[in-house]
Amino acid sequence: MIVEVFFRNYYRNYAKFDVDAVEKREFAFQPFGGGMVRHKAFKSVEELRRFAVEKTPRHMYHSSAYYERPDEGDMERKGWLGADLIFDIDGDHLDTEACRESKLVSIACLNDAREEANKLLDVLTRELGLKPRRIVFSGNRGFHVHVADEEVLALGARERRELVNYLKAAGFDPTRFAAKLGRRKVLLYEEEVEGNLLRIRQGVEDPRALKVEIDEVVTQDIHRLIRLPGSLNGKTGLAALPLTQQDLEKDAGEIVEKAVAFRKGNLKVRFTKDLRGPVLFDRIDAGEGDVKVLPAYLAIYLELQDFGKIYD
């Protein structure tokens, strides 16, 4: 498979994995042939990179949790030590015109997701006093935010669910909210919090301002697998790209451009189904059976999305 060759070359020459405490994480991989390989452990990022070159998986994941025995197959015997707090904002979950129009990666939909991610960061930092450890473009239609503050690591599923409810304004009482963060208890009163909870004031006129559209299942799962920052997204061929908060202020087109892994050359694609609409930086107008010569990154994206086949 031509795409697999491109992935292997990327992992051999360009990949920079961004993950803390490698030796305490479970890693999981989805091969190009399908299935899932779980409960892998590595002593270093370099050992992980060698594995990626040798096996060339389509998808690479690491656990949000830290374990005493990350390679143990029995979850009860892994020895859970705590878990990062993970937030996933995905265009698939955004009810905006741009995201409804296309299920492929479009810059317009990503800008909507980027705005939602900025709203999340504002709530985390200004309302809850949490500092994101890592912000990552998923390589597809959204963003991941990792929080590793000491006070959140020991939070169980129930406490994380309370936080989800707060972020999504589910059953929200605008006069008072209590959130337990480890030993710290934050009481949020509209009249007492610095900034007077901007979301509450805006929410009187626009209820959408109260709600942050996160994937609630991801955040409350204390054993969650999340895409490995620096790896390639097997649905798109784009890199899962670590970002700064300043990067997140830029247009999504600039973010995607930095995530392009295959910048050189063109490939010939035969379309296996009709495709008409925006895809990445381009607009595609092709019918089933059409043949087009496209930039390598776009050809790989279309094959991974099952819209065409690359051939010599």
From Swiss-Prot:
Reported function: Catalytic subunit of DNA primase, an RNA polymerase that catalyzes the synthesis of short RNA molecules used as primers for DNA polymerase during DNA replication. The small subunit contains the primase catalytic core and has DNA synthesis activity on its own. Binding to the large subunit stabilizes and modulates the activity, increasing the rate of DNA synthesis while decreasing the length of the DNA fragments, and conferring RNA synthesis capability. The DNA polymerase activity may enable DNA primase to also catalyze primer extension after primer synthesis. May also play a role in DNA repair.
Cofactor dependence: Mg(2+); Mn(2+)
Domain of life according to the entry: Archaea
Enzyme Commission number, as recorded: 2.7.7.-
Active site per UniProt: D88, D90, D215
Protein name in UniProt: DNA primase small subunit PriS
Single biological process term from Gene Ontology: DNA replication, synthesis of primer
Statement: the UniProt record of this protein carries the keyword Iron-sulfur: no
Coiled coil regions, renumbered to chain: none
SUPFAM superfamilies linked to this entry: Prim-pol domain
Alphabetically ordered keywords of this record: DNA replication, DNA-directed RNA polymerase, Magnesium, Manganese, Metal-binding, Nucleotidyltransferase, Primosome, Transcription, Transferase
Gene Ontology MF terms: DNA-directed RNA polymerase activity; metal ion binding
Gene: priS
InterPro entries: DNA_primase_S, DNA_primase_ssu_euk/arc, DNA_primase_ssu_PriS
Subunit-structure text: Heterodimer of a small subunit (PriS) and a large subunit (PriL).
Pfam families registered for this protein in UniProt: DNA_primase_S
Gene3D superfamilies named among the record's database cross-references: DNA primase, PRIM domain
The protein's enzyme class: transferase
Gene Ontology CC entries for this record: DNA-directed RNA polymerase complex; primosome complex
Transmembrane regions: none
